[in-house]
């Protein structure tokens, strides 16, 4: 009987110990769970705080950048205006020397002149026409430098400009010559302008050998014509 009572008391003690241990285990688990949940809540709060703080930081950076750009632009504008140099505006420039036979290079824009005096080669006396023809011949001879450089557009421009004056002036001179001298001078003039046309074609074709050939013929024809002019 005594042994049975003792065994029952031992079982009760063991069961209480087991219950207390289970309670302790459950309590520790609950504490750990609560700690974990609290930690996760704190972590979430920290992340939200960081997100809220990053927005004003970026806005502050953008504002600082705009202010710096404004200051730099203002200093640049000040420097530009500081370097501005005033330009004095006066009256029109004096008439400059123009082509032979014109009073000045602005003659075509002189609205006080008649159209025939502004846009056409002005007629000269035979003596003045002969002098201008010699000047035009010199300019034609000077195209040799452009031929050597193969500057073909310049060769064509000078040839056509000077040849137009030369043809006009030679016709003036021929018309004043005696009848027995007119035909020979006309023949020399026709040969001269044929060689000038050949030289112009060589320049248009960009052929150096042909340009050299017809340039020599042009110079020879010019000398023959100028010798007749006196």
UniProtKB/Swiss-Prot annotation:
Tell me the protein's name.
Oxygen-evolving enhancer protein 3-2, chloroplastic
Sorted alphabetically, which Gene3D superfamilies does this protein's record hold?
Oxygen-evolving enhancer protein 3 (PsbQ), four-helix up-down bundle
Identify residues that carry Phosphotyrosine. Answer: 215
GO CC terms for this protein?
A: apoplast; chloroplast; chloroplast stroma; chloroplast thylakoid; chloroplast thylakoid membrane; cytosol; extrinsic component of membrane; photosystem II oxygen evolving complex
User: What species was this sequence derived from?
Assistant: Arabidopsis thaliana (Mouse-ear cress)
Q: Transit peptide residues? A: 1-49, 50-82
Task: State the encoding gene.
Answer: PSBQ2
What family, per the record? Belongs to the PsbQ family.
Q: Name one Pfam family in it.
A: PsbQ
Output one GO BP term.
Answer: photosynthesis
Record lineage: Eukaryota, Viridiplantae, Streptophyta, Embryophyta, Tracheophyta
